[in-house]
Amino acid sequence: MSFQLAPYLAKSVPGIGILGGIVGGAAALAKNARLLKDKQITGTEAAIDTGKEAAGAGLATAFSAVAATAVGGGLVVSLGAALIAGVAAKYAWDLGVDFIEKELRHGKSAEATASDEDILREELA
């Protein structure tokens, strides 16, 4: 009998997250391949974006599975919980990635006048 990847990964939450990362990464790669072909982004930008999207999709998928399992209930309740949890996780992931990228672009220096709390408050406003 041949190896069955999806059923194997579906046996655990990390496996479900990996499967979500594969699917999310494939979708991002398809999008970035078109942008790369049209010379709208560089190869490096495509690779970085694909990696970020794959990781975010994997995290959101795993979180979604945990939420649906924890809530239980019928099909509609489980689907609703999975959708809400997945959206929340991906939204939080994207905010975090954007914040980190902004910090890296601006080069946080030791002599910075703004405290970490001020920067976070500015980002959340």
From Swiss-Prot:
The entry's keywords: Biomineralization, Iron, Magnetosome, Membrane, Metal-binding, Transmembrane, Transmembrane helix
Molecular functions per Gene Ontology: metal ion binding
Lumenal face of the membrane: 30-64
Entry keyword NAD: no
Lineage top rank: taxon: Bacteria
Cysteine pairs bridged by disulfides in the record: none
Residue ranges of the TM segments: 9-29, 65-85
Topology with respect to the bilayer: Multi-pass membrane protein
Region (Magnetite interacting component (MIC) binds magnetite): 36-56
Effect of loss of the gene: Single gene deletion leads to slightly smaller magnetite crystals, but no other measurable phenotype. Deletion of any 2 genes encoded in this operon (mamC, mamD, mamF and mamG) decreases crystal size regardless of the protein combination. Deletion of the operon leads to smaller magnetite crystals in irregularly spaced chains, but no other phenotype. Deletion of approximately 80 kb of DNA, including this operon, leads to cells that are non-magnetic, lack internal membrane systems, grow poorly, have reduced mobility and take-up and accumulate iron poorly.
Residue ranges that the UniProt entry lists as topological domain Cytoplasmic: 1-8, 86-125
Homology family: Belongs to the magnetosome MamC family.
Other comments on record: The most abundant protein in purified magnetosomes. This bacteria makes up to 60 cubo-octahedral magnetosomes of about 45 nm in diameter which contain membrane-bound crystals of magnetite (Fe(3)O(4)).
Role description: Plays a role in regulating magnetite crystal size. The lumenal domain may bind the magnetite crystals, affecting crystal size and shape.
Identification of the protein by name: Magnetosome protein MamC
Source taxonomy: Bacteria, Pseudomonadati, Pseudomonadota, Alphaproteobacteria, Rhodospirillales
